[in-house]
Amino acid sequence: MSAFRRVVTGHNAAGVSVIASDEWVSGVVLPGMPSIELNRLWGSDTVMRYPDTGAPPVYKDWFAPIGGFRIAEFTIGPACAAAPDHDDADASQQLARDFPGLLEVMDPEVPGMHRSTTIDFIYILFGRIELELDDGSKTQLKAGDLVVQSATKHAWHNHWQEPCRMLGVILGAHYESPA
């Protein structure tokens, strides 16, 4: 399981900058999908206001609402298939608990395909990944590439032997369905 060192700055009572926290945060393996790991690094449901103490903002859902943001790390391993002994009902309950809002954006007809009402800036840290859109187009990406995911329906596929690790900055956005 991957871990990130998260150093957060803040302000003391006199308004002087301080290190508010310095800790390791670990990802969570998706239930029933042992090759996918998600790590919520930081986020807020509202615009941040300063000065502050550097305490973690309170937020619940995986995706940010308008005015909010998330920073997350995603690791997708090769052969992203369900574990042979997984129970769909148990996995769904655990996903709903650990990653609120994630199931709601998934396309039940196309495994892995999803759309959120966010703009996502996805930077490939290492490995390779294929981005598939609902028009059938597929784009191969590698370490150093950046995807600006503009509330489009998409899926990620890892056809290679090594895991792909991505860092995402996710901002809440307005989305109006085409007529």
List PLM regions with ranges:
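Ligand-binding loop in jelly-roll beta-barrel domains
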Residues: 69, 77-81, 136-138, 142-145, ...
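Short, small/polar residue-rich loop motifs at catalytic or cofactor-binding pockets
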Residues: 3-5, 116-117
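A short local loop/turn or secondary-structure capping micro-motif enriched for an aromatic residue
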Residues: 26-30, 58, 81-82, 140, ...
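Conserved short histidine dyad/triad with adjacent acidic residue
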Residues: 24, 72-116, 150-153
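A short beta-strand-loop-beta hairpin characteristic of the jelly-roll/cupin
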Residues: 108-116, 121-142
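Short, well-structured hydrophobic secondary-structure segments
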Residues: 28-78
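Double-stranded beta-helix
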Residues: 7, 11-12, 16-21, 27-28, ...
